[in-house]
Amino acid sequence: MSADTHESHDHHGDHHHVLPWWKKYLFSTDHKTIGIQYGLAAGAFLLFGFFLMIVMRWSIAYPHEPLPGYMSWIFTDGWKARWLVDGKVTGETYNMFGAMHGTIMVFLGVVPLGFAAFGNYVTPLQIGAPDMAFPKLNMASFWVYLAGGLVMCMSFFMESGAAKSGWTNYSPLAGYADSQIVNQFLAGQTQWLIGLVLLITSSLLGSVNFITTIIQLRAKGLTWMRLPFFVWAMLVTGFLLLLAFPPLEAAGIMQLMDRVTGSSFFMPSGLFSSADGVAMDLSGSGSPLLFQHLFWFLGHPEVYVLLLPAIACVAEIIPCNTRKPLWGYKSMVYAVIALGFLSFIVWAHHMYLTGMGPVISTFFQTTTVLISVPSVILLTSLIISLWGGSIRFTMPMIWAAAFLPMFGIGGLTGLPLAFNLADLHLHDTYYVIGHFHYVVAPGILFGLFAGVYHWYPKMTGRYMDNFLGHLHFWPSLICMNFLFFPMLTQGMAGFHRRWYNGGEGYIEKASDGVNVFGITVAEKISLNEVMTASAIALAIFQVPFLVNMAVSYWRGKKVTSDNPWDATTLEWATPTPPGHGNFTFEPSIYRGPYEYSRPDHDTDFFPQWEEPKRDEPAEKPAESPEEETTKA
């Protein structure tokens, strides 16, 4: 496509009335703008959550040293007096930062970035829809999410500080924390619960919208087995959110009532104050165990809410850059559906230490092992898709390729935790932290970074810079492994995840003869300094990415085609960037999503929307989505 054609595409949709800036960019109902809003907001929350982690890691590595100036500047004089002692992080501050780090990174960062940002921008384009099914509901979903996030983060400015009961918010601690505050609505723990309810409400609005959009707004000829895998992943993720989040929302409301109205849904009898040993004035008879069940019923499907968008991005990038079809497409579709189903019957493997009997623990051990099967199918299909391909090592492809082994490490290190005998020793140690972070950080975030580099040209009409991309990728890969792998070895040595001083008291009592991988338990405390240095370096090497995002928007190399990657899915048939209504023609789909290197075609890609030539063999006509849905 010529530059002149590209420029005219930039003005696609000008025949529609011009909206005021606040309606076009702030309170927009356009799925693309909302996707970008989600991405920017989630990115800001991720940076804040990352900062909290840096402070925590300093406390772990150097518990007797004050925070350096580049960390302590954010603390006002009042905050320093309240949350630091001689400039050092206290145990209370560590608990607060730990609770908010987990909450922010999961609920405010990765989930909205993967599902809401990428899903909002890409899904309607890939199915040939002009927008989401409910545009105003889509806008409401974003603003409810932002309100929930701000409520949670503003709790840092409360007299009590933010929540300190861990990101899981277990009762009875979470039900009684900050109880000295007269107005409980001004307590950080209460603000956390209010924010949680808002975030879940936002997710429910979004999930209904995604499910309806994918079922009802597919283009002509886009049958179920012609959907890109990305869309399948968004559909399954939507159902996970729709079915798993309501129990946690109910739990959040009940815990809120425990704090504000004096009820005892989760508060047991017989609790005594640790300060003075006096019995607490509670009605009692509640069940803390019930809250754990409600939380983890969401908590494990939530892992796949985090994971599936990243796998979806990688599944789009690998075929495009190997120039061959996605291996085992149907197997991957069935696997992701099975993964969604099984994720609802494994939650109690987080609760082996709560005293469940052998029968029920055997059931959850079995289902936990079973759920690894569809995960292995997905990962294996992506790896085999590389075999025999003409691989183009673009920046998206490099990130996608790195995702595969990193996610593999995260998955394999989770297998021992499926068995209660192993979990008895590893539960709440740094092994669990290392396993989870291998899945979320070098796993999921690498997949999402790949997605940013892949779709950035479509969003902006410009490429991201390759040099800055490599400067971002290679140090990030190295730093993440130096940050998270030592956690696995520390965990096997018994290091607990909640020690704000890095485990000084533990190693004093540890036997010098005990070692893991040839390193004694006492020597393993030095790994804290390695991990902290890696975390700080990792933060520094995210700067090239931020610079790349900003500078490329204004000065990046312009794309010369609406389909710069020579891809086959429908989003590349739109103008660049897509205008109002997305398409300049009514899209029809004639084939599957990954038709690369077909011997009967003159180029190495055969887009879904390209009509067959007269001399080509006619393909079996597809039913319209409406007819297919009616038959189903």
What positions do the PLM features span?
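Membrane-embedded and interfacial regions of multi-pass energy-transducing membrane proteins
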Residues: 2-632
